[in-house]
Amino acid sequence: MARRKRAAARKKKVKKNIESGIATINSTFNNTLVNITDSDGNTMAWSSSGACGFKGSRKGTPYAAQIAAETAAKTAMEDGLKGVEVRVKGPGSGREAAIRSLQAAGLEINAIKDITPIPHNGCRPPKRRRV
């Protein structure tokens, strides 16, 4: 019988002491994504409502956004992160909840920017829903 090869040993995660970073919250109607990067744009931690175990329409709720932001903040704070500049994108209901939970997790919020893309009369929008 052929022997199984042993899996390669993983390197231990090196703790980086990064004082400040950028937290990008992308909140859509269906989900909320939280990505925490250092000042160069390298991802330190990320989370989403779906990755936290929410399924279907519950991913779009403010509570799911709160849990996602908490998870990402805890992971980033293990790397030594203390303060963040928050960039919010999208029209979803989890925007404010995610910002509040970043602050409650112990991160100092230095600035809040809204970077939602707004067209200057670009593409034609989809037709209105008739329910």
From Swiss-Prot:
Annotated GO CC locations: ribonucleoprotein complex; ribosome
InterPro entries per record: Ribosomal_uS11 (IPR001971), Ribosomal_uS11_bac-type (IPR019981), Ribosomal_uS11_CS (IPR018102), Ribosomal_uS11_sf (IPR036967)
Domain of life: Bacteria
Xref: Pfam families: Ribosomal_S11 (PF00411)
Entry GO MF terms: rRNA binding; structural constituent of ribosome
GO biological process: translation
Keywords tagged on the record: Ribonucleoprotein, Ribosomal protein, RNA-binding, rRNA-binding
HAMAP family tied to this protein: Ribosomal_uS11
The protein's assembly and partners: Part of the 30S ribosomal subunit. Interacts with proteins S7 and S18. Binds to IF-3.
Function: Located on the platform of the 30S subunit, it bridges several disparate RNA helices of the 16S rRNA. Forms part of the Shine-Dalgarno cleft in the 70S ribosome.
Family listed: Belongs to the universal ribosomal protein uS11 family.
Protein name: Small ribosomal subunit protein uS11
Gene: rpsK
